[in-house]
């Protein structure tokens, strides 16, 4: 397994990895948009796979990704994305709230607070809402899982979002973050 030059250096600490997660996830989700389908096809397919994993949509080959917009640290929410999908001519809108955890546990009822902010912002008749916690931990502590379940969040270790045992994409940035050990 190759080691990531992007995510690991000689520092004793790795800086603020959660901020890096916000930026890379934002970029990854936006690269799933159909406007990038021919530019770097392997990268596009990988980004689609990640987006549909977070949306919990299987059998997505027929779905077109019309647009993806992302916001980092909106109302203290790590990342949120608006996605417009075209399923056989029917436009469907999805919004994802993503909380990432590298070091710290969920605290101060934050998942429920963020969910409430999100739900007050979106009209449920127009948007399908998704709540996701992504952690860099290989094993998610049971207390974190319980808090996610209680708040209606799906939870994933980073390697469950996308396995690093894939062929290289056409993007060094993607490869360094998603396909290297760090």
Model-found features: residue ranges?
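Charged, terminal alpha-helix-loop-beta segments
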Residues: 1-182
């Amino acid at each position: 397994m190759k080691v990531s030059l992007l995510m690991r250096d000689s520092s004793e600490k790795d800086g603020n990895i959660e901020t890096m997660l916000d930026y890379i996830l934002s970029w990854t989700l936006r690269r799933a948009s159909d406007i990038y389908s021919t530019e770097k096809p392997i990268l596009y397919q990988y980004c689609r796979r990640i987006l549909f994993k977070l949306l919990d949509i299987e059998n997505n080959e027929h779905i077109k990704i019309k647009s993806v917009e992302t916001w980092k640290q909106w109302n203290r929410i790590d990342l949120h994305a608006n996605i417009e999908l075209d399923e056989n001519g029917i436009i469907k809108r999805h919004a994802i709230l993503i909380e990432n955890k590298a070091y710290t546990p969920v605290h101060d009822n934050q998942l429920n607070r963020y969910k409430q902010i999100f739900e007050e912002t979106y009209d449920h008749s127009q948007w399908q809402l998704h709540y996701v916690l992504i952690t860099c931990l290989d094993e998610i502590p049971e207390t974190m899982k319980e808090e996610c379940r209680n708040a209606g969040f799906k939870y994933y270790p980073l390697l469950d979002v996308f396995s690093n045992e894939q062929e290289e994409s056409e993007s060094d940035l993607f490869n360094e973050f998603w396909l290297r050990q760090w």
